[in-house]
Amino acid sequence: MAGEHIKVIYFDGRGRAESIRMTLVAAGVDYEDERISFQDWPKIKPTIPGGRLPAVKVTDDHGHVKWMLESLAIARYMAKKHHMMGETDEEYYSVEKLIGQAEDVEHEYHKTLMKPQEEKEKITKEILNGKVPVLLNMICESLKGSTGKLAVGDKVTLADLVLIAVIDHVTDLDKGFLTGKYPEIHKHRENLLASSPRLAKYLSNRPATPF
């Protein structure tokens, strides 16, 4: 997106914006990362089309503004623009399959959000002893089927980025949950960071946030 200014607007967290941020980082695209506090959100909300975050504001050289909404649609758009959705129809399917599997895990994680602590702990226990292990095993099987070291072949795709964003959310719920299990997921992250120094640097330097 040469000549364009890209602003990613979200709260001060990883959340639904992280796959967008990581896609831009992995593609080597500069962007402005605007993080909004919950206190400031009510006065900023009317300025965002649809009043929802994340949103991306793209301003061209002539000052024309384009708003982009819906987190995964934005991430897919950016990934496609920068050749990160697979090189063949088969790879595209594999990318989308892994995104779907990761989103199934994300759906479970979302059940814990905005809940009182006692209820959150109860839900966390239920999902980590229920659907999440099943879903993670499905992801491991998909990773085993890759023709390369990454999620789909040897080039970074959106599947890699959505996956590690979701795995970080699982770790947020229980820091030791993945320890000694799911070797394919651990190896995938190791291979991804080795394949993309830009992404490795971003992850090591990004601010610690609760979500």
From Swiss-Prot:
<dbReference type="InterPro" id="IPR036249">
    <property type="entry name" value="Thioredoxin-like_sf"/>
</dbReference>
<dbReference type="Pfam" id="PF00043">
    <property type="entry name" value="GST_C"/>
</dbReference>
<feature type="binding site">
    <location>
        <begin position="55"/>
        <end position="56"/>
    </location>
    <ligand>
        <name>glutathione</name>
    </ligand>
</feature>
<comment type="subunit">
    <text>Homodimer.</text>
</comment>
<protein>
    <recommendedName>
        <fullName>Glutathione S-transferase class-mu 28 kDa isozyme</fullName>
        <ecNumber>2.5.1.18</ecNumber>
    </recommendedName>
</protein>
<dbReference type="InterPro" id="IPR036282">
    <property type="entry name" value="Glutathione-S-Trfase_C_sf"/>
</dbReference>
<feature type="domain" description="GST N-terminal">
    <location>
        <begin position="4"/>
        <end position="86"/>
    </location>
</feature>
<comment type="function">
    <text>GST isoenzymes appear to play a central role in the parasite detoxification system. Other functions are also suspected including a role in increasing the solubility of haematin in the parasite gut.</text>
</comment>
<feature type="binding site">
    <location>
        <begin position="10"/>
        <end position="11"/>
    </location>
    <ligand>
        <name>glutathione</name>
    </ligand>
</feature>
<feature type="domain" description="GST C-terminal">
    <location>
        <begin position="88"/>
        <end position="211"/>
    </location>
</feature>
<feature type="binding site">
    <location>
        <position position="10"/>
    </location>
    <ligand>
        <name>glutathione</name>
    </ligand>
</feature>
<dbReference type="InterPro" id="IPR004045">
    <property type="entry name" value="Glutathione_S-Trfase_N"/>
</dbReference>
<feature type="binding site">
    <location>
        <begin position="70"/>
        <end position="71"/>
    </location>
    <ligand>
        <name>glutathione</name>
    </ligand>
</feature>
<dbReference type="InterPro" id="IPR004046">
    <property type="entry name" value="GST_C"/>
</dbReference>
<comment type="function">
    <text>Conjugation of reduced glutathione to a wide number of exogenous and endogenous hydrophobic electrophiles.</text>
</comment>
<feature type="binding site">
    <location>
        <position position="53"/>
    </location>
    <ligand>
        <name>glutathione</name>
    </ligand>
</feature>
<dbReference type="Pfam" id="PF02798">
    <property type="entry name" value="GST_N"/>
</dbReference>
<comment type="similarity">
    <text>Belongs to the GST superfamily. Mu family.</text>
</comment>
<feature type="binding site">
    <location>
        <begin position="41"/>
        <end position="45"/>
    </location>
    <ligand>
        <name>glutathione</name>
    </ligand>
</feature>
<keyword id="KW-0007">Acetylation</keyword>
<dbReference type="InterPro" id="IPR010987">
    <property type="entry name" value="Glutathione-S-Trfase_C-like"/>
</dbReference>
<dbReference type="GO" id="GO:0006749">
    <property type="term" value="P:glutathione metabolic process"/>
</dbReference>
<feature type="modified residue" description="N-acetylalanine">
    <location>
        <position position="2"/>
    </location>
</feature>
<keyword id="KW-0808">Transferase</keyword>
<feature type="binding site">
    <location>
        <position position="16"/>
    </location>
    <ligand>
        <name>glutathione</name>
    </ligand>
</feature>
<dbReference type="InterPro" id="IPR050213">
    <property type="entry name" value="GST_superfamily"/>
</dbReference>
<dbReference type="GO" id="GO:0004364">
    <property type="term" value="F:glutathione transferase activity"/>
</dbReference>
